Amino acid sequence: MMKHLLSIFFIGALLLGNIKTSEGSLSSALETTPGSLLSDLWLDRFPDPFKILERIPLGLERDTSVALSPARVDWKETAEGHEIMLDIPGLKKDEVKIEVEENGVLRVSGERKREEEKKGDQWHRVERSYGKFWRQFKLPDNVDMESVKAKLENGVLTINLTKLSPEKVKGPRVVNIAAEEDQTAKISSSESKEL
């Protein structure tokens, strides 16, 4: 059943992309840029498997009473650094935690708690999301991990990270491989020292 629905969806998308209107192709409606209709529909139904690690921590205990809701994120790189913006409306700064790990991972977590229900209250609609959220990002090597600054304003958490100068960026460490005779020579020389 799911295969048939996906086939119909893709055939329809291909047909729509080839139909011309007075303004050009309808393929602009099929764009997958963030915020486009197709992108939102696609991401709601089929999340990017490579982004799952950014949203759900491996060690997170599952609490069935509280849903995990992701915070929407924008991340831009400028000449001076990186700026990460998360939408977290209704949260105070003491309800949000920002962690930076030595391995270059930035983690933002928090919880939006549901309002306490009072006796006699009758809810007509509950649409706002509640629960824990968690986002984690693998930062590039050019980020100064000591430069992390954050501010929370109008429901948007903005995290600024400064770039390191090119000469301070640590590249991968090259490991020398010893030949077998080098190992034998080291062993025999260490044995002779012990005698």
From Swiss-Prot:
Q: Does the keyword Glycoprotein apply?
A: yes
UniProt-listed GO biological process terms: cellular response to hypoxia; response to heat
Task: Glycosylated residues: list them.
Answer: N160
- Write down the InterPro entries for this protein, in alphabetical order: A-crystallin/Hsp20_dom, CS_dom, HSP20-like_chaperone, Small_HSP
User: Which SUPFAM superfamilies does its entry note?
Assistant: HSP20-like chaperones (SSF49764)
Gene3D superfamilies given in the database record? 2.60.40.790
* UniProt name for this protein: 22.0 kDa heat shock protein
Cellular component GO terms, alphabetically?
endoplasmic reticulum
UniProt entry keywords in alphabetical sequence: Endoplasmic reticulum, Glycoprotein, Signal, Stress response
Provide the organism lineage as a comma list. Eukaryota, Viridiplantae, Streptophyta, Embryophyta, Tracheophyta
**Domain of life here?**
Eukaryota
Check the record and name the PROSITE patterns matching this protein: SHSP
